[in-house]
């Protein structure tokens, strides 16, 4: 079923192999009168919340409707790259800290902290190992990257996966909040493969 769903989506032109790298975005929060944001050549290094470009070279931009088909079929790995809130260093002694959960698209893997423009060596290792594991070493496994509407974290993470040789990278700019706005379900999640 999963292989058939991928073949169907490829033949319908919903995956990278069936379309040029330019895509279209559904549920954009950028006003129609705003000038489109140009795709930079490098990573976004700061001010991660803000209008994003409508494209990502080498990736297929997917709409909510397209992602729903992928999600229901299980044909792609959904990767939420929203950063994880860190324990404040100045908490008063004796304060109990509980790592917050995140609500994202059910079945997603939350790869926290991999969408920054510059990654620590530890974050690079975590990201590479996680992609290797979730793709089962198949560089053509469909990988969908998202975080929130108008957030560069997913754009950066998807760009990095492309640079590492992943060939079926999909980018979902509306993020978990765009998914929720479409009245689709969210589920609580914790970071994938991290010690909490």
Where in the sequence are the language-model features?
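Glycine-rich nucleotide phosphate-binding loop and flanking beta-alpha elements
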Residues: 85
């Amino acid at each position: 079923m999963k292989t058939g769903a991928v073949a169907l989506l490829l033949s319908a032109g919903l995956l990278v192999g069936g379309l040029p790298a330019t895509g279209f975005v559904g549920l954009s929060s950028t006003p129609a009168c705003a000038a489109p944001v140009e795709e930079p050549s490098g990573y976004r290094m700061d001010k991660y919340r803000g209008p994003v470009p409508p494209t990502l070279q080498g990736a297929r931009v997917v709409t909510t409707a397209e992602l729903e088909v992928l999600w229901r079929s299980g044909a792609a790995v959904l990767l939420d790259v929203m950063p994880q809130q860190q324990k404040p260093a100045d908490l008063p002694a004796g304060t109990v800290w509980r790592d917050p959960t995140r609500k994202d698209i059910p079945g997603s893997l939350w790869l926290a902290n991999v969408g920054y423009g510059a990654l620590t060596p530890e974050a690079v290792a975590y990201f590479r190992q996680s992609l290797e594991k979730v793709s089962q070493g198949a560089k053509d496994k469909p990988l969908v990257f998202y975080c929130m509407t108008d957030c560069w974290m997913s754009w950066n993470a998807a760009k990095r996966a492309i640079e590492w040789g992943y060939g079926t990278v999909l980018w979902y700019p509306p993020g978990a909040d765009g998914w929720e706005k479409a009245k689709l379900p969210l589920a609580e999640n914790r970071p994938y493969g991290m010690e909490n």
